[in-house]
Every structure is written in structure tokens, then in C-alpha cells.
Amino acid sequence: QPLLTANGYNVNTVDITSEDIPADTDVVVIPAPKTDYLEEDIKKVSDFLNNGGNLGKQLLYIASYGQEDTPNLDEFLSEYGLSVGKGVICESDSGKYYNSPCITVASTVSDNFTQDVSTEKPAILSALCRPVNTLFDEQDMVSTDAYLKSSDSAYTANVDISQTTGQVNIGDALVKGQQNYMAVGSKAKFTDDNKTLYSNVIAVGSEGMLSDTYLQYSQYQNSEYFISVINGLTGKTAGITITPKTITGNVFDITQQQKTVLKWTFCLGVPVVVLIVGIVIWARRKNK
């Protein structure tokens, strides 16, 4: 929250089950819902992105490995050529993970919308990240692009976290090979005056990448990168990026107590930072 406030962002929260998304909203964020959206909730989000046929809206969908099955959200994401896979992304090469095979850094970062990132090769840290798959490259005015990728030595696996020790137990590999941490699905429309309008769905596989903890690590560019992507998609003019107080040193020299803290951070969820421009709605679904 301090990061976004310092950079001129505003955040509002909407209960998607009982409220409509205001018409002047630019970005909607769905932050790691633990239960599925109802069909009427999905319609509100879909109508927001269609914007009466004018497009020009953005959605940031944040998945979580602790989610229940979400068939309605899955069907919605598929309309933008995206799906969130089973398990979490792990690395088999010890040189590509830290402390645990499921705490990794993206090996490939797309050049798209990195205009506000201070380094040519940003390092994006992630933990317990579900794979974000692209269903096609281009189809019926919808195109997809993977923005953050793992190395070829990655794989996905189910994990089990001990509620007492925080120990992460990794199961057998489900899918081997390069995985996506984040992908974007874009719906396009051509206007009569030869302009192209877009609405975009940005799907991220883990709330950990946007947690306050990871945004503060000076060794990684999570905060710069995600602000830069949202700025680029919405057309926000870049300014001086103000980052929160940073944490330096070796992130992964941690005690058992700190491991337990990380367990709660990634197992039960953390306050998710919402990247927004203009008026942004943080769409939550009330559990009933």
C-alpha cells in the first residue's frame, strides 16, 4: 500500500457479490480468491473489460496454490487464452532456486512494458507459483504473451506444507520443462478510424510475487517490474518510482522461526499489493 500511494495510485475495494464495478474504473484486481466466482460475478468482470464495446480496461488476476477448484474463473480466463495449471513451479537445477526448489527467480523476462525498470535484466522472485499457461498465440482477435518464464530445467509439482514446522514437501513432477510465472491475454478491436483498442488480462501465478515482503527486497525488481507493466498497459506517464524501505542481505539465510513466518505468508495468504492507475477496484468475493 505505501508503495502504491507514494506512486500516485488509489485503491478501492468492491464486494463483487453485492456491488457493481464503477464505470470509471481503469483496473480491476482479483487477488488470489480462495473460492470460485459465481456466474453473475464473472459477468460483472467480463462486462467491465468489454466496456460497452470500447475495451480499454485492465484486469490483474492473481492465482494461489491454496485455491479450491475455480471452474467459472477458469472458463473466463480461457476466453483470453489463459489457464492456471496444477501444482507449483519448481527448479531441478540447484543453481536456479534458493533454499527450496519452489522458491525461484524468473529466467526470462519479456521486454514488454519494462520502461520503468532500472536494470536491463530484472530479477523477479517467486515462491509457490502456479504455472500460467497460454492456450493459443492468436485466435478471434485475442492474443497471448508469456511475460515471465522459468528455465528449461523447471517442472511443476504438488506441495505439502507442514502446519507445525513449515517444512515444504515436494511431490513427483507433473509437467517438466519451461513454465510461465505470468502471462497476458489481450482482446483487440479495430475502430473505424484505423485505431486498435485493447483490454488485457494479466494472470500471475502467485500472490507471493506481490507480497509486501518480496516487494521490499533490494536484490529483486518485483516492485519496479509490476508497476512498470501496469503503467505500460494503462498508458500512465512514467515518473520517479518510489520504492518502500528495502531489505538487503541474503534473503535465504533464514532461521526456523522465519521459515514458519514464510509458511504463513505463502500458505495462508498475504495482503496483496494492488497495482492501479486512476481508479482501481480490488474485487473481492465475500465467502458465504
Each PLM stretch: what is its role?
Residues 272-284:
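Alpha-helical transmembrane segments
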Residues 199, 266-270:
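C-terminal target-recognition/interaction regions appended to catalytic cores
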Residues 209, 216, 241-266:
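Short, aromatic-rich amphipathic segments at membrane interfaces
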Residues 237-241, 273:
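Residue-level signal for secondary-structure boundary elements
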Residues 1-238:
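Acidic, S/T/G-rich, low-cysteine, solvent-exposed domains in lumenal/extracellular/periplasmic regions
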Residues 286-288:
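Short, charged juxtamembrane terminal tails flanking transmembrane helices
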